[in-house]
Regions:
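The canonical Cys-X-X-Cys-His
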Residues: 65, 69-79, 119, 134-138
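Bacterial N-terminal signal peptides that target proteins for export
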Residues: 1-9
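Gly/Gly-Pro-rich "capping" loops immediately C-terminal to redox-active cysteine motifs
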Residues: 64, 78-108
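Bacterial N-terminal signal peptides
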Residues: 10-17
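Electrostatic cytochrome c docking/interface patches
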Residues: 29-67
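Extracytoplasmic/secreted proteins, especially bacterial periplasmic and envelope-associated proteins
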Residues: 56-60, 64, 68, 85, ...
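Short sequence/structural segments immediately N-terminal
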Residues: 68, 143-145
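Axial heme c-ligation environment in periplasmic c-type cytochrome domains
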Residues: 24-32, 84-91, 109-142
């Protein structure tokens, strides 16, 4: 009987924690206002079209990307781009075609293992402008690591 009491005390904590783990993959992507960004069209562009922007345009892209990341990516990939170990640390994506190719593949195809969706196909929820603004923001903070 003495062993049962501590177990009863921790049962509600374990139950609450299990709901948080289950909810991890059940995040509904949030739409992002990209009306102030250069428009890219419907066809996916293979290389970050915002990489060489400057001035106020670049500032808007980075601000939009930071907001889009925090609303749609941070839960798995970590606040401010710093992964807590659940999903890859995106600050290590290279600011070149190889990094863009991996990013593009993942946002277009998501991540599914053994039938479990770890990441949705983000192109079904966010515009190309929003996604490339996230990559541009990640490139802007990758210099800090």
């Amino acid at each position: 009987m003495k062993l049962l009491k501590p177990g009863l005390l921790f049962a509600p904590i374990l139950l609450a924690a299990s709901f948080n783990i289950y909810a991890h993959g059940a995040v509904t992507p949030q739409s992002i206002d990209t009306s102030e960004l250069p428009q890219l069209g419907e066809e996916w562009i293979d290389e970050n079209p915002y990489r060489n922007e400057t001035g106020e345009t670049l500032k808007n892209i980075i601000e939009t990307g930071a907001s889009a990341y925090n609303q749609n990516c941070a839960r798995c990939h970590g606040l401010e781009g710093i992964s807590g170990g659940i999903a890859p640390d995106l600050r290590f994506l290279t600011p070149d075609f190889d990094g863009d190719e991996w990013f593009g593949y993942r946002v277009q195809n998501g991540a599914v293992r053994n039938g479990a969706v770890y990441m949705p196909k983000m192109t079904e929820h966010l515009s190309q402008e929003a996604l490339w603004s996230i990559k541009t923001w990640l490139e802007s903070i990758s210099e800090d690591i």
